[in-house]
Amino acid sequence: MITRRDLLKTFCALPFIACLPRPVNAQNIVDFPQLKTGYAQRLKKILAAGELPYIDIESSCNSMKADIDSIAKSMDRLNIGLMALSADIGKGQFEKGVRFDNLSEKLLVSYPDRFIPVGNGGQPPVLTEAPDAFLDAQEVAARKKQMMLLGEFEFRHYPSPRQVKRGDTGRDVRVPIDGPTGHRVFSLSERTGMAFQIHYEIEDELLTPLEKMLEQYPKAKVIWCHLAQIRYIERASRYTPAYVDALIKRFPNLYFDTAFGDAASTYPPSNQRHARVWAAFGGLKSEWRDLIVAYPKRFLSALDLGQDRLERITEYDQKHRDFLKRLPTDIRHQVAYRSAWSLLFSEDFS
């Protein structure tokens, strides 16, 4: 039974509840300054506890299946600072006409200090079967300030090791980066000032088209996912630390995320260890380490979690921290959270 005292407690609490900050208003417009304050407080709290937070700039999920409460608890347990958790529009949603999934809005209502509002993943079927409608919807959301960065666009994507094992060939994607869709994405980044991510397999024949797009859209902020992840080494003779060094010097708005497998990770179709940053016995190759040390502001932490591996967040966290600990302390902090902070807010973290 509700007593008079219970009612009094409830009514007394109402003014306090009404004053709680709301990161998303009635028009679904995200309050970026308010989010920024909450993000900074969370990062500083983890740092004050003597732990290293990082900003996961690249993870995704199925918004209909993901257990957000579980993810948030794991972030607290593992001292993960922030996560850009993108919603992938699957076949079911696509067939219902969904072209923008507002997962970020829901995340910010429940956990405004943990999640970065991000656009949807550009992958099949939306990017391959309805690219214009998909990009129209992403642009509307971007202009309404419903996100801080665009999602990950799969221009060239081999099936992942997990997809290969289960015979899923639907993610063998080829969308010309210099085609109409690529031009729209690069242009959208320039016009909105928002960064976007590309999944772009490393092959010699794919490098020149990317370079031309970077030249044509110098203000586009591009995060090339999976540094030095080469599935077939025989197809990638040009891609070396020296080549990446040259790209960094030529293109000031090009970034790289550090989501890659561990030293033992093998790509089944080629039977090759595809995370090329690692030496044979598990240490970072000196030439890749030196490159990161030389340009730490251009490298970002990332886990690359997906719906089929969200339950492995602890494993992915451990592997990413194993990479981070091999960097000098100041560089470690830069890559872990400072680089992403600068990219999102155009200022140094302080």
Predicted regions: what they are:
Residues Q34, R42-L47, G97-Q197:
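Active-site gating/metal-coordination segments in enzymes
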Residues G38-R42, A66-I71, G97-K106, A133-Q138, ...:
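Alpha-helical scaffolding within the catalytic cores
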Residues Y54-N62, A66, S70-E95, R114-Q123, ...:
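Divalent metal-dependent hydrolysis catalytic cores, especially in the metallo-beta-lactamase
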